[in-house]
């Protein structure tokens, strides 16, 4: 393969013919492949089936988990999540199977009531705003969009969001009420915030007294290498600056046990814990304590969680490697037409193609039987300013399907690139 960027129009047309023939071969296969969402595969969920073997319903303190009560969650469940997140059990609220629901509920509290330090509910603020590191998690952005909260893009780097920009915007504009963050193995780049980035979040001054950091630790134990990466605990780092009330940390067992039957958790300050419980107690008496107990008995402690996640890692690494190897073999020789991330953990690989090509790549893949996350989905309002980013989710399909999908993707990337270059030369 030659460098596409150095080809003449005639050479590009010849390459286009070859690629279209290869593409038609894929279309003729009648493929049905899906790499659109970061879901655990059946082989991963099978690892946690022993969770259902426990029939015990009595908590350590004698609480009958079958009954009402314990809004904040069973103490042993709070202790387990506290150990995973690096906070005291008393600062943990254990919810249902969805941490996303907890995030939605907290934005709703801000919107409807405000927080103790709020001058007024967010709904009464003229043009309330959120900072959104990009590319980021599409479902975060859907929450703020649902409430009509304006979203501001903040560029990401391997060290985290552009903190100069975050500090400037949040420090000057009181209508900016929060920021979405995935600090460890970020969705979708797989970046982990540097210690300095975390500490700048902890210390920064904000114009809004009720500025909130939605700190989504979705991948806190989801390592893909022998290196166990851990970031400073934002809630603890914020205390010396008196900023602990601005921190909402989230995690869940969605990608540890079962996405549809797991347990979620929120960590926050003492003051915020009291306030959140005051709001939640009107809505629910308690979440599923039997499920909390099952998870505690199965996972036991942080060491147990890490041991369980090692089993996940053994199944996932070959799939991630297959994507990266195929990209390197089939795209690198074509010149600087694409690059991709090399995550040490998490659930995704970011593929960056030439500006103006991502939507076309996704379209070609779909028409050949491979569904990807929509181009632009990792940006607020679904609008990628460069039309260059695609999120690759290699976790759910089988290894053979990942290999086949990766090969097809490279054909689509190359074809879209050649089309783009020919259009530029026309």
Residue spans for each PLM region:
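N-terminal "arm"/small-domain region of PLP-dependent enzymes with the aminotransferase-like
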Residues: 2-72, 76-83, 367-370
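Conserved core of the PLP fold type I
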Residues: 63-209, 220-242, 408-426
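Conserved core segment of the aminotransferase class I/II
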Residues: 123, 236-317, 330, 418
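Conserved PLP-binding active-site segment of the aspartate aminotransferase-like
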Residues: 350-355, 372-412
């Amino acid at each position: 393969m030659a460098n596409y960027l150095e080809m003449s129009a005639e050479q590009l047309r010849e390459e286009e013919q070859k690629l279209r023939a290869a593409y038609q071969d894929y279309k003729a296969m009648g493929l049905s492949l899906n790499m659109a969402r970061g879901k655990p595969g059946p082989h991963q969920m099978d690892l946690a089936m022993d969770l259902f073997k426990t029939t015990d319903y009595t908590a350590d303190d004698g609480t009958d988990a079958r009954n009402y009560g314990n809004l904040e969650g069973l103490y042993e469940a709070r202790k387990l999540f506290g150990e995973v997140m690096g906070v005291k059990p008393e600062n943990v609220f254990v919810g249902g199977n969805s941490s996303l629901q907890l995030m939605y509920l907290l934005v709703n509290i801000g919107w409807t009531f405000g927080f103790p330090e709020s001058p007024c509910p967010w709904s009464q603020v003229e043009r309330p705003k959120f900072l959104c590191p990009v590319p980021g998690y599409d479902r975060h952005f859907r929450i703020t969009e649902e409430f009509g909260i304006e979203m501001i893009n903040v560029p990401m780097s391997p060290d985290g969001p552009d903190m100069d920009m975050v500090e400037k915007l949040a420090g000057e504009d009181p209508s900016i009420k929060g920021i979405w963050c995935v600090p460890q193995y970020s969705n979708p780049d797989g970046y982990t915030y540097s210690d300095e980035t975390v500490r700048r979040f902890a210390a920064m001054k904000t114009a809004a007294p009720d500025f909130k950091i939605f700190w989504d630790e979705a991948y806190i134990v989801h390592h893909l290498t022998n290196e166990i990466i851990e970031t400073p605990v934002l809630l603890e780092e914020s205390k010396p600056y008196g900023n602990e009330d601005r921190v909402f940390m989230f995690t869940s067992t969605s990608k540890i046990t079962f996405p549809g039957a797991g347990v979620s958790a929120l960590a926050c300050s003492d003051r915020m814990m009291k306030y959140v419980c005051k709001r939640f107690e009107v809505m629910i008496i308690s979440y599923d304590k039997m499920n909390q107990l099952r998870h505690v008995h199965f996972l036991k402690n942080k060491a147990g969680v890490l041991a369980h996640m090692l089993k996940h890692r053994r199944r996932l690494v070959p799939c991630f490697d297959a994507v990266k190897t195929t990209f390197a073999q089939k795209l690198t020789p074509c010149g600087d037409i694409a690059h991709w991330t090399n995550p040490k953990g998490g659930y995704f690989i970011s593929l960056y193609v030439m500006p103006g090509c991502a939507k076309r790549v996704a379209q070609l893949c779909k028409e050949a039987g491979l569904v990807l996350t929509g181009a632009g989905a990792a940006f607020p309002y679904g609008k990628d300013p460069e039309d260059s980013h695609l999120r690759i989710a290699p976790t759910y399909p089988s290894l053979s399907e990942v290999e086949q999908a990766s090969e097809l993707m490279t054909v689509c990337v190359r074809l879209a690139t050649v089309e783009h270059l020919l259009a530029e030369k026309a």
